[in-house]
Design a protein with these regions (language model features):
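Interfacial segments of alpha-helical transmembrane regions
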Residues: 19-26, 92-105, 154-165
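Short, Lys/Arg-rich, polar N-terminal cytosolic tail immediately upstream
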Residues: 1-18
Length: 205
C-alpha cells in the first residue's frame, strides 16, 4: 500500500512546488520589482522617471541596493521559468515547452547580467548588450509559447494573448529606442523613461 501511494504523493507535492515558483517568480516578483524601482525613483533627488532610464537607478546613491534587487528579480524570473516548465507538461509538447522555457531562462540570465554590470561608463556596453538579449529572448519566448498554446483549444486564448504581446513588445521597444536616440523627432520630448516603464510593465504582465 505504501509503495502504491508513494508515486501519487510525489506528483501533487511537485505540482505544488511548481505553483509556488510560478506564483512568486511570475506574480509577486514583478509587482515587487515595479514598486521597488518606482519608489527608488521617487526618493532619489533630481531623478525623473519621465526622462531617465530605470538603469540610472543602479548607479549613484543607493545604486548597489537597486542592483541587488534587480539581480534577485532576475533570479526569481528564472524560478518562474522552472515552475512554468513543470506546470505546462500536460499542455505544451516537449519541443514548444523546452524552447520557450530556454528563452525565459536566457531572459533571466541576461537580466542578472544587467544587474551585475550596471549603466556606469565602465560597464555600460555589457549592460546594453545584455538588455538587448533580454528583450529579444522575451519576445522569442512570447512567440514560441504563444504558437504552442494556440495549438491547444483550451489554451488558445492565452496563446493569442502571448502572440499579441510579442507585437506590442516589439512596437514599444522600437518607440523606446527612438525616444532615447538623439536627433529623432521624439527625442526632444524626453519621455524615454516613461516609455521604458510602460515596456517594463507590459513585459511583466
Amino acid at each position: 500500500m505504501q509503495k502504491n501511494g508513494a508515486p501519487g504523493s510525489v506528483k501533487p507535492r511537485g505540482d505544488q512546488t511548481a505553483r509556488w515558483l510560478a506564483l512568486i517568480g511570475g506574480g509577486i516578483n514583478p509587482i515587487a520589482f515595479v514598486l521597488a524601482y518606482t519608489l527608488a525613483g521617487l526618493v532619489r533627488p533630481g531623478y525623473s522617471p519621465i526622462h531617465q532610464a530605470i538603469s540610472d537607478l543602479g548607479v549613484g546613491p543607493n545604486g548597489s541596493l537597486m542592483d541587488t534587487i534587480a539581480v534577485l528579480h532576475a533570479l526569481l524570473l528564472i524560478a518562474f521559468a522552472v515552475g512554468f516548465a513543470l506546470l505546462m507538461r500536460g499542455v505544451l509538447t516537449a519541443g514548444w515547452r523546452w524552447f520557450g522555457v530556454a528563452l525565459l531562462v536566457v531572459r533571466g540570465l541576461a537580466q542578472v547580467t544587467t544587474g551585475l554590470f550596471t549603466d556606469a561608463p565602465a560597464t555600460v556596453r555589457i549592460h546594453s548588450l545584455a538588455t538587448i538579449v533580454a528583450l529579444l529572448s522575451m519576445m522569442g519566448a512570447f512567440t514560441v509559447i504563444g504558437l504552442g498554446l494556440v495549438r491547444t483549444p483550451q489554451w488558445r486564448a492565452w496563446g493569442t494573448y502571448s502572440l499579441v504581446a510579442t507585437l506590442v513588445t516589439l512596437l514599444l521597444v522600437a518607440i523606446e529606442f527612438w525616444a532615447f536616440r538623439p536627433g529623432t523627432p521624439l527625442a526632444p520630448a524626453r519621455v524615454g523613461g516613461l516609455l521604458e516603464r510602460v515596456l517594463s510593465v507590459e513585459m511583466l504582465a
